[in-house]
Swiss-Prot record:
It comes from Mycobacterium sp. (strain KMS). InterPro entries: Ribosomal_uL5 (IPR002132), Ribosomal_uL5_bac-type (IPR020930), Ribosomal_uL5_C (IPR031309), Ribosomal_uL5_dom_sf (IPR022803), Ribosomal_uL5_N (IPR031310). Keywords: Ribonucleoprotein, Ribosomal protein, RNA-binding, rRNA-binding, tRNA-binding. Part of the 50S ribosomal subunit; part of the 5S rRNA/L5/L18/L25 subcomplex. Contacts the 5S rRNA and the P site tRNA. Forms a bridge to the 30S subunit in the 70S ribosome. One of its GO terms (molecular function) is structural constituent of ribosome. The lineage of its organism: Bacteria, Bacillati, Actinomycetota, Actinomycetes, Mycobacteriales. Pfam families: Ribosomal_L5, Ribosomal_L5_C. Belongs to the universal ribosomal protein uL5 family. GO terms for biological process: translation. The gene is rplE. This is Large ribosomal subunit protein uL5. This is one of the proteins that bind and probably mediate the attachment of the 5S RNA into the large ribosomal subunit, where it forms part of the central protuberance. In the 70S ribosome it contacts protein S13 of the 30S subunit (bridge B1b), connecting the 2 subunits; this bridge is implicated in subunit movement. Contacts the P site tRNA; the 5S rRNA and some of its associated proteins might help stabilize positioning of ribosome-bound tRNAs. It comes from the Bacteria.
Amino acid sequence: MTTAEKTLPRLKQRYREEIRESLQQQFGYANVMQIPGVVKVVVNMGVGDAARDAKLINGAVNDLALITGQKPEIRRARKSIAQFKLREGMPIGARVTLRGDRMWEFLDRLVAIALPRIRDFRGLNPKQFDGTGNYTFGLTEQSMFHEIDVDSIDRPRGMDITVVTSATTDDEGRALLRALGFPFKEN
């Protein structure tokens, strides 16, 4: 019986070998546990039209499963809203929470492949941090991910991606994500 050797994701290896040391020097942490890291990545795809046509949620679930490599959780409406013809319990979105190696591989694919494929991409807004080092940004369509076959897209679906870090301030989170290769706009 052969033992399959587990390889470390490329971005995780770079974080452990280079980025942690540079962040420690930059911010002068007294303890190695203070160095910020990525905790999880949440990918959310809201499908508001699913209230009218329940089949639309299946396309979002399939797209998210292909992009992230993990089965999405279907999000349901918490309360009824008559103006939107929405009833409590109707499916209105899909969400995936990535941790561990899957998270590192997704971030690597996002930064190295998906973001550069966006047309007229000028960089991510560096001001979209939440005050505690977490970063959220939106993508307008799913076609920039190479896992999705462009010909099989029935409709463009946007998504929100939240990168949750253990940083305590926005500056620490920004420095971490910039070191990981996130293309932020220069002011």
